Amino acid sequence: MLGNSRIAQAALVAALAGAGLVAPAPAHAAVSRAELALRWAPVHYQDVDATGSHALGGKSDYLTRVDFDGDLVGRDNWDDAATAGASFAAAAYYDVVETSTHWYLTYFFYHPRDWVDHPFFETEHENDGEGLTLAVEKDGSTYGVLRGMVTVAHSDFYSYTPAGGTWTSGAESVDGTVQLQSSPHDSFQHPATAQEAKGHGLKAYPQITINGDGIVYYPSTVGETPSSGNDRDVQYQLIDLFAADGLWAQRNNTSLFVSLGTFAGDDSGDCGQGTWDCTTDSANAPWGWDDGNDAPARGELATDPAKLSAAYFTIPGSLSRTYTYNPYSSAAAALKKAAETLPRTID
């Protein structure tokens, strides 16, 4: 029996590895960054609106991959979302950077459209990228303990701490409590987050919640396609931003990005047709996120989260500012120049 159990466990690990991630490690094993990302990834509530032609029957609010249409071209995504070949298999991107005291996990949620349902006095745009960064303290346990969360809602950041946590308001006031919720697909308590329909601003649940139709996404090694706009159990696949062919590696791809951290998007085709107003180049990758009226620079929520955490929160004990793992540092000069020179993008 013991031998069969080990064989079954090995087979499970091999299957998960083939999917790009492995299951969370037992307490005695060293944890990988992929395992950390899976353990802490949010239970995610997505409000869905099916009103009007730009909603695509609700699909404009479905999470998906940046290459949902089979290419890494930013300027065809609005129209390709309406084609029969578009994939809405659920996905979210992640990265992990690390110091001696903390792990910082960023999650990036992508939609092909930031849309509106009426054509007057409103704007929409091609591509939409919002998300969050978690600060997890290395407390000696396998996965650490969640201390803080900062989310991106358009051009504003919102900060949260878990109930009973030790971090408090710093230069920015804490905006609320991040709930921890269970998943039917694993044994962990996950942060609960939510995105609004249409514009997809992201906050802690239930500061945003499902109003009528909506999808509840659960982190996984596989990406499921919602059965409808009112599916309450959809698994989303986690994709490593730092993979060899990942989004970070594509940062200088001019078909996908118009500048460092800003997606290329235009107003051709259906976006901006008639009396709708469609802005161009209006969505950001994590290294382009910018609150605009806080001290940390453009992109630092993802690229220097220790700095941002020290600014946003009052933190007891030690918080190292020296990274032991941070692939963003390879482009430090370019990121600094982008923060100093690029116009602010309002997502």
Model-based region annotation:
Residues M1-A29:
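Secretory targeting and sorting signals
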Residues A30-G131, G140-D347:
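A domain-level signal for the mature, folded cores of soluble proteins
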Residues L134:
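Short, positively charged
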